[in-house]
Amino acid sequence: MAFTDYETEQLRKALLKETRHCAVTLGMKKTSVDQLTKAVGIAKGSFYKFYESKEMLFFAVLENIHSELYGVADHALSEADSLPPPERTAKAVLAVCRRLSDTGDMVFIENDAKLLLQRLPEDVKNVHYHDDETHIRQLLEKYDLVPNRGVSLAAATVRGLILTVSHKEQIGELYPQVLETLVYGACRELFK
């Protein structure tokens, strides 16, 4: 059955939405193409008109998550343009952490992203995938923010702070205050 352009776009969105849900709740390994196609109401054979493989679909989800997170950081930096660099960057990091906490996407990133990237063809990674440091560097340059000990340390620190999202339960009810303390302290150190 041929799909109209509109149907194709709607089905692509539905596949992405369902895959993101499964990425967080089941994980990539436990999610099957059969399960995804049943959820969106298409035949298994039709799946391959949308994506070459399950991994390519999960990669599209990972790219969407990254784009959303960098959009959140970009918006926070733009909104806080009157603040000094430490507070401005802290607001961006906190916004990203809150987004990850609210969506549950950190489960997918921590549990499946590394395996997913290992399974992708090199040409796909070379064309489409950019590491966090590249994106963080672009945001810092866009807003003329210069960390005093280098972008590599700033990017590694941001990754470390973001990893606290996955330990929210262990930290307990004081997690929001702990996160703010860590983020503001790190940003003051990086941008003093």
Which residues fall in each region the model found?
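Basic, helix-initiating cap at the start of DNA-binding domains
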Residues: M1-L26, V33-A39
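An amphipathic alpha-helix adjacent to DNA-recognition modules
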Residues: E9-K17, K30, F50-D74
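Hydrophobic/aromatic residues within well-ordered alpha-helical segments
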Residues: L11, K54, V61, I65, ...
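Helix-turn-helix
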Residues: C22-M56, A60
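Hydrophobic alpha-helical connector segments
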Residues: A60, D74-D102
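Amphipathic alpha-helical packing segments from all-alpha helical-bundle domains
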Residues: S67-Y70, L117-L145, R149-A156
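Short linear capping/connector segments at secondary-structure termini
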Residues: D74-A76, I109-R119
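Hydrophobic/aromatic-rich alpha-helical bundle segments in the mid-to-C-terminal region
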Residues: E141-A186
